[in-house]
Amino acid sequence: MIVEGYGKVLSRPQLDLARRELCIVAACAASRQDRQLHSHLHGALHAGASESAITETLGAISVLVSPDDAARHRMLWARVQGAADVH
């Protein structure tokens, strides 16, 4: 399952890993998958996505979700940014 369902998706050559993670961040936010969003926010950073690109991705999705969901996504992103600053 991990190799077939996850590894092959993340290793496809059409998109670089940072862009792929940004797409996954958008999908997780839009579908209210907060635990996965948390993981992929970290993943996007580790894959080389800039903080501004992640912020812009969440901003683009914010028009599609409720104000409460958008606020929750911003809080989660702020926590991830704080954790990244510690390391």
Predicted features, each with a name:
Residues 1-17, 46, 62-87:
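Acidic, glycine/proline-rich low-complexity segments that act as flexible tails and inter-domain linkers
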Residues 33-42, 55:
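Short conserved catalytic/interaction loops centered on acidic-Pro-aromatic/His motifs
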Residues 17-20, 41:
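Extended alpha-helical surfaces
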Residues 47-51:
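Accessory, usually C-terminal, subdomains that scaffold auxiliary metal cofactors
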Residues 20-28, 37, 57-58:
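Short, structured motif recognition centered on aromatic/hydrophobic residues
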Residues 30-34, 65-66:
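Short alpha-helix boundary/capping elements
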Residues 12-13, 26-31, 44:
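Short, glycine/charged-rich beta-strand-loop motifs at protein surfaces that mediate ligand recognition
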